[in-house]
Amino acid sequence: MNANPKFLSADAHVDAAAVAPLPNSRKVYVTGSQPDIRVPMREITQADTPTGFGGEKNPPIYVYDTSGPYTDPDAKIDIRAGLPALRQRWIEARGDTEVLDGLSSGYGRERAADPATADLRFPGLHRNPRRAQAGKNVTQMHYARQGIITPEMEYIAIRENQRRAEYLENLKASGPNGAKLAAMMGRQHPGQAFGAAAFGANALAEITPEFVRDEVARGRAIIPANINHPESEPMIIGRNFLVKINANIGNSAVTSSIGEEVDKMTWAIRWGGDTVMDLSTGKHIHETREWIIRNSPVPIGTVPIYQALEKVNGKAEDLTWEIFRDTLIEQAEQGVDYFTIHAGVRLQYVPLTANRMTGIVSRGGSIMAKWCLAHHKESFLYEHFEEICEIMKAYDVSFSLGDGLRPGSIYDANDEAQLGELKTLGELTQIAWKHDVQVMIEGPGHVPMQLIKENMDLQLDWCKEAPFYTLGPLTTDIAPGYDHITSGIGAAMIGWFGTAMLCYVTPKEHLGLPNKDDVKEGIITYKLAAHAADLAKGHPGAQVRDNALSKARFEFRWEDQFNIGLDPDKAREFHDETLPKDSAKVAHFCSMCGPHFCSMKITQDVREFAAQQGVSETEALQKGMEVKAVEFVKTGAEIYHRQ
């Protein structure tokens, strides 16, 4: 499908729904050690506790915000100009890059000179790409191993802490019961972190820039931050940090336009997508990607073999190292932050898939398997891996080593092909680390619950704790249309066991290309799974939001319940289906139980009765039961009464 002309006209814009602030929320910025380290967070305002429940102040809570400038009313959003180059000064100040005279990729130059693409191109880029100076390495891992704390690392430390300390201090200062309130709202259940370094007996009270540097230096975390994507807001992927989620977007040969993909990106980050992968396989892949990157505040990943295949008209056997290499450079100079590269699909593993129920289900894996069989040679990705590393470190592109032999059904889970490839990915990780190139490892797939932990344990062992990035896994194969749920179950589990980033699955998985509604559904499901994993691991401060929402629920602060939740719009919509009037927003019940059977209202009544009688809640319950017993006998001791 050709690009939508309306999107590319002078009035091109993102839809208003993607840029409006979320209810009762505002963008706030926390400044670091220098003025241009301004870390965004979402502040959610809360109402005071009603007088009947104590009348105390409830200070705002702060949550991680991936939406970039889009939800900041003070920001001027023009997708034809792109986002501000947030990291440009930091990159320049390091003095180890050079601005190129033009594009290095032959295909990139061809597209730039093609008059047929003139009306499709992103018009707002007025700078040439950068590359490392000769002999220099510009990866965040390289800096970390030199003992350097970069502005990106400081930014991340501030971001991961989510102003938790300030929130608790505000609680303490909120009134006479402030200290008690802070202790209650800061309380968190101990987690089980399966050996993760940041948790347990010596858990960090807060994430520090030095801790970020150390985790990146060890290879346990990555900061995907291509020097040609200065618009990105630094983030980190590692099991000692908040579990992140990725959203896949991208056109296909039969549907979607450039405009729709940009809208999907802004929609995905609004609801919490930490990274976005552009998996476009249709027309104008190069131009689509440029629009997305220039307007994205989150890291962008791709699978370069998809575009390379388009360059040879879809014939896998016609792929060459030279075409693939040019594609890597083309995308690196556009600013792609991480590449999925299926270098672990080796010739010797392909026959191991013959007895599978569903064979090879990875598109990238099947492309490389077909090439290996057609030439009866080892994959050129494997053979040229060191050369790929040289490209990656010249732009600071991170590896996402692809699981091309992942199981496509629970029948095939943890088989010889899958685990053989995983072991190879561990070997390739060591090669990449020799070049100080950042690496994460992709994982399955379809795995029943009882086999999930084995996947995590083997990955940690064979890949030396490089971050794991998994698609789900889907825990059953019986629910087309609901695979965001079948996979969300597995995602929560594997996130708890140590996976650093979860790739979302939408309700359209296995059925079709997701639209914006599907993207939101997938994002919310996976934010839920990631948060559940953070709670289970005992991540510092993970329970703050739960505690705030629970307190609002108990105090019947309906608007706060909606707004603190992951999807305020849906929560409000569901409530208003049965109780649409404004008066219902202050009622001490909902339509589930009604006014007489609300457990929380009954508890409040017990507390009020106890206060009036000057006794404890336990004594109040006992006294109340005694009163009711006498009343029961006086009315005839009948269980049922005729009306």
From Swiss-Prot:
Listed InterPro entries: ThiC (IPR037509), ThiC-associated_dom (IPR025747), ThiC/Bza_core_dom (IPR038521), ThiC/BzaA/B (IPR002817)
Superkingdom of this protein's organism: Bacteria
Keywords per UniProt: 4Fe-4S, Iron, Iron-sulfur, Lyase, Metal-binding, S-adenosyl-L-methionine, Thiamine biosynthesis, Zinc
Residues that bind substrate: 248, 277, 306, 342, 362-364, 403-406, 442, 469
UniProt remark on cofactor binding: Binds 1 [4Fe-4S] cluster per subunit. The cluster is coordinated with 3 cysteines and an exchangeable S-adenosyl-L-methionine.
Top-level enzyme category: lyase
Obligatory cofactor(s): [4Fe-4S] cluster
Catalytic activity field: 5-amino-1-(5-phospho-beta-D-ribosyl)imidazole + S-adenosyl-L-methionine = 4-amino-2-methyl-5-(phosphooxymethyl)pyrimidine + CO + 5'-deoxyadenosine + formate + L-methionine + 3 H(+)
Pfam families: ThiC-associated, ThiC_Rad_SAM
Subunit structure: Homodimer.
Name of the molecule in the record: Phosphomethylpyrimidine synthase
Organism classification: Bacteria, Pseudomonadati, Pseudomonadota, Betaproteobacteria, Burkholderiales
